[in-house]
């Protein structure tokens, strides 16, 4: 599903960026994926996706 229509960014692209780079802030996420650069309507949904994905990332100290 498209999250950002202005830049054609999908939820899958956001999820992949979060899984690969583990951003902790929206600023960090925006450096990885072009969201919120035009109208800004996608920011809320992108943040929600980031929060959902961050909850699924297992910290390294729990893996060992």
UniProtKB/Swiss-Prot annotation:
One Pfam family in the UniProt entry: Fer2_BFD
Matches recorded under InterPro entries: BFD-associated_ferredoxin, BFD-like_2Fe2S-bd_dom, BFD-like_2Fe2S-bd_dom_sf
Cofactor: [2Fe-2S] cluster
CDD domains (alphabetical): Fer2_BFD
TM segment ranges: none
GO MF, one annotated term: 2 iron, 2 sulfur cluster binding
Cofactor: how and how many bound: Binds 1 [2Fe-2S] cluster.
Alphabetic keyword roster: 2Fe-2S, Electron transport, Iron, Iron-sulfur, Metal-binding, Transport
Residues annotated as binding [2Fe-2S] cluster: 4, 6, 39, 42
Family note: Belongs to the Bfd family.
Function: Required for mobilization of iron from the bacterioferritin (BFR) complex.
The protein's assembly and partners: Monomer. Interacts with bacterioferritin (BFR); up to 12 Bfd proteins can bind to the BFR.
Protein name: Bacterioferritin-associated ferredoxin
Annotated gene: bfd
